Amino acid sequence: PVAEATTAVGRFTILETIEKCKSIEIEVLYGDTDSLFLKGPTREQIQKIVDWAKEEFGVDLDLDKEYRYVVFSTRKKNYLGVQKDGKVDVKGLTGKKSHTPPFIRKLFYEILEILSKVQSENEFSQSKQKVGDMISQYAKNLKARQIPLNELAFNVMISKAPSEYVKTIPQHIRAAKLLEQTREIKKGDIISYVKIINKPGVKPVEMARPDEIDSAKYMEFMESTFDQILSSMDLDFSTLIGAPKQTGLDQFFWN
């Protein structure tokens, strides 16, 4: 198969490049199918590798990003990196998605702000404590149903009229059908709904009560949103909210 052959060639090139880096005393921190993370190489060393790859394999290597620091999780391919301008990269970010409830999105950006200011390993350790405390406090507020309903809302645009959904009915359409009891709902409308403990599992924000909120469902969404960041910091969501900790060690590399 072509895909397998292409993957094999890519893997071979990466492995050979790793060996070449070692031969000119560049420390390779991590490599996958299409990238390498190198610890503090000089411009001259980078150019040597670029020239070598072009001559040896006809491959153009580019310096993609320069990180102030990067943290690799014990989980395969999970990492967190902060570029020199303070921009935070975390593989598989979900906190930026437009339908993410405001309270989770707010926490997400607060965490990125903390990480972007880290300038040393000691500050990184302090940031872990801050991040852990923040998530723990948000979780407590969620369990106590102290977060305003509008902050819990999933905001989704409907692509067609609710009546056009027959077989599979998404959650935002279930909420839209409830809203139809009070007003007309049409294609293009934004439906704001919250997750509740009783059927049908969701309610429009304007029809919901705080005591109906399914805090467990929101906790699951919090965990899935922050899993990549936390695993890269050797923090465990379950531990932060009071459950047993999973073991793991992070690897910190400063440039």
Feature map (PLM): residue ranges:
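DNA-dependent DNA polymerase catalytic subunits
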Residues: V2-T33, L38-N255
